[in-house]
Structure formats: structure tokens, C-alpha cells
Amino acid sequence: MLRLDLQFFASKKGVGSTKNGRDSIAKRLGAKRADGQFVTSGSILYRQRGTKVHPGLNVGRGGDDTLYAKIDGIVRFERLGRDRKRVSVYPVSQEA
């Protein structure tokens, strides 16, 4: 005698709608000031996780790796070698 065990239908039928539908909100990471822009002391320049961009001259790094300006000045995004980036703030000269 030949015994066949065939299954034609799904054992669970479409019971996933309440298990789907989760998505986390965006964290709003990235550059907050552009290259060449004037910033005041304490301004957030770059929000990040880890050190995608490193702090340069007159730039501090917060506990969550956020980069902020230590002085008033002009923002400059620079490259360090092939694969590292740095952001610095240079003071504005007082000639006018």
C-alpha cells in the first residue's frame, strides 16, 4: 500500500497583520550646518553615531558623538587622507 502525505494549503493562513507594522522613527542624524556657514559657539554641526566625522580645530565632541562649535566662526568640512572626514571652525578676521 502506498501512503502519500500531501499538503496543499498553508498551515497558517494570513495571520500576520498584527505582527507587522513596526518601524522606528528617524533619528535626524547628519550635517546641521553647511561648509562656509557662520556659526556661533555651542552650535551643533553634525549629529552622528560613532565618529563618521572627526572633530577638528575649535570643534568639540559630545557624549553621543555630536560635534559642536567651541567658538564663533566659519565651518569647514575637510578630508583627512582617503577615508576620514573632519569638521573645523575657523575664527572670522576682524578686518572691516
Curated annotation (Swiss-Prot):
**Keywords of the record:** Ribonucleoprotein, Ribosomal protein
Q: Where is the signal peptide?
A: none
Q: Which domain of life is it from?
A: Bacteria
- Recount the PTM note: The N-terminus is cleaved by ribosomal processing cysteine protease Prp.
A GO molecular function assigned to this protein is: structural constituent of ribosome
GO CC annotation: cytosolic large ribosomal subunit
- Do you know which InterPro entries this protein is assigned to? Ribosomal_bL27, Ribosomal_bL27_CS
Q: Name one Pfam family in it.
A: Ribosomal_L27
Name of the protein: Large ribosomal subunit protein bL27
Origin organism of this chain? Geobacillus kaustophilus (strain HTA426)
